[in-house]
Design a protein with these regions (language model features):
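RecA-like P-loop NTPase motor core of helicase/translocase proteins
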Residues: 1-523
């Protein structure tokens, strides 16, 4: 891959897909004759102009291109490996540098796609659309008593952490209320008019309700006709294996006593050695999950936020270690019936250090909907610096100070910035009320640590008379204080905070990262 075109596969496949999809909106595109009747029905439902005009929601151009590129790569071109896909969509790229050697490696010896989409542009809807496409085609093949290796009813969705994991469960199973998930609040049910023709909805609803397995149910829960497993990547990664083991082997040399003990008792119990009962239980469970997934005849893995699990640093280099080992084990023996679909806004590894540091993009990127394109489409926010003459000349210290008794207190600069932000919030609340009364802007204050966040909350109460309901503190201290049971409702409220009038202000200590919907924050 050249520096001029670091994403040759995405460029080549997009050009081919756009050619095949000319006339997609009126039903005359060539692609309709190149796919199964099931896929053609879905494409018409998703993209025919007459149908799109009848509903409130539709896929935006970035989502549309991601879905179409995936279908062309997997169903139309039917490439069994990444190398085969390059030969059909970007053959010239194989002549550049080490591309051929890279894509011919064992870890790419199956269908493997990376969808590069900016954060906040609806990757989950693309994931759900592709899952539905796979499921319904697998159903059609089974009904015809046929085997089509391109399609499966077994799915594994991997999240980068617990917040996104919970969001994925919400998307498929519905919101958790009083310990029970309400399927009617799931994305699949709420946006059924987008995803599915009416005659196919109950089929998909039944599959989701009957086959979803949370991370502690994988391999244990009985599912009737497939699998929809959702987990965070830590359950599957070989995270306990040391990444950097420097040493010299000396056969025949006397062994140290601790080495003899380690040979006889490889696990030394105790938290200090990393072998608490909780850790040992997780290792045992992980082994069972990997064995179960490896035993499946076919599987599609949807990997959300893929950049998180490819990054393992060793001597200044970032390489694929932890996650790739597990994937290779699961994929073994499946051939083209193992499919990997990665979603990431930043699908690259940082290689080198200092002046030699550079980005090496994943070779399996098949679509590129980057941040600039998303901003031009109005799908993500752009930052605006609000210059104010009245505070421009003031020295604004952005960190807390201490009073005469050594207790932390807000600096005058912090107070000025909070006042300015709250003034902006009140203006936005007035403006929003005239445009969409059901959307409520919020003010987000990010503090340096948990000693400062209570000071900020108190400032809003004292300065502006805001109640506890109007100011929500979101940090590890608050979570520890409340406990998981009382914290869960707060976390759920954050997921759709812009639908509620209160809270007006959210005070955080860098907890709002992956999974927090940026559409909700306006100040």
């Amino acid at each position: 891959m050249s520096q001029e075109n670091p994403l040759p596969l995405a460029a080549g496949l997009t050009a081919k897909t756009q050619q095949l999809c000319l006339g997609l909106e009126d039903g005359s595109a060539d692609i309709y004759d190149l796919v199964t009747p099931t896929t053609a029905e879905l494409l018409r439902w998703w993209f025919l102009e007459d149908i799109c005009q009848t509903r409130r929601f539709n896929f935006h151009p970035g989502q549309r291109q991601a879905i179409l590129n995936s279908i062309v790569a997997h169903e139309v071109l039917a490439a069994p490996t990444l190398q085969a896909l390059y030969r059909q969509a970007a053959p010239d790229a194989l002549l550049e540098g080490t591309t051929l050697r890279e894509v011919a490696s064992a870890k790419h010896a199956h269908p493997k796609y990376c969808l590069k989409m900016a954060t906040g542009t609806g990757k989950t809807w693309v994931l759900q659309a592709l899952l539905i496409w796979q499921l319904l085609n697998a159903n059609a093949a089974r009904a015809a008593v046929a085997v089509d290796p391109r399609f499966t009813r077994n799915f594994l969705i991997v999240a980068p952490g617990l917040i996104v994991y919970d969001r994925l469960l919400d998307a498929f199973c519905g919101k958790l209320q009083a310990g029970v998930r309400d399927f009617s609040t799931s994305d699949v049910a709420r946006y059924a008019e987008l995803f599915l023709p009416e005659g196919l909805r109950e089929t998909v609803f039944g599959f989701v309700r009957g086959n979803v397995c949370a991370k502690d149910e994988i391999g244990l829960k009985a599912t009737g006709n497939g699998l929809l497993a959702i987990t965070n990547w830590h359950l599957l990664a070989e995270a306990d294996e040391a990444v950097d083991e420097a040493g010299i082997e000396a056969p025949g040399a006397p062994l140290e006593p601790q080495q003899v003990i380690a040979g006889l008792l490889p696990l030394s119990p105790g938290r200090a050695t990393g072998n608490s009962l909780e850790v040992l239980d997780r290792r045992y469970a992980r082994g069972g999950v990997l064995d179960y997934l490896a035993g499946l005849t076919d599987l599609v893995v949807f990997n959300d936020e893929a950049h998180h699990i490819h990054e393992v640093k060793k001597e200044g280099e970032t390489t694929e270690v932890e996650w790739q080992k597990s994937l290779s084990r699961i994929a073994e023996g499946k051939g083209r019936r193992f499919v990997q679909v990665d979603f990431s806004a930043t699908p690259y590894n940082d290689v080198g250090a200092g002046k030699n540091k550079r980005k090496v993009f994943f070779p399996h990127i098949i679509v590129d909907f980057d941040l600039q394109a998303a901003m031009r489409a109005g799908l993500v926010k752009s930052l605006v610096l609000d210059r104010r003459k009245e505070i421009g000349a003031l020295p604004l210290a952005s960190t807390a100070e201490r009073d005469e008794d050594g207790n932390p207190t807000l600096s005058e600069g912090q107070r000025v910035m909070l006042r300015a932000g709250f003034a902006k919030l009140k203006k936005l609340e007035t403006d929003f009320a005239t445009v969409d009364a059901e959307k409520h802007p919020k003010m987000l204050v990010v503090c340096e640590d948990t000693t400062v966040s209570p000071l900020v909350a108190r400032f809003f109460a004292d300065e502006f008379g805001l109640s506890d309901e109007e100011v929500m503190a979101v940090d590890s201290g608050k979570k520890a204080e409340l406990g998981e049971k009382d914290w869960a409702p707060i976390r759920e409220r954050l997921f759709d905070v812009d639908r509620h009038e209160k809270p007006r202000v959210i005070v955080s200590v860098l907890m709002l990262r992956e999974g927090f919907d940026v559409n909700n924050i306006c100040v």
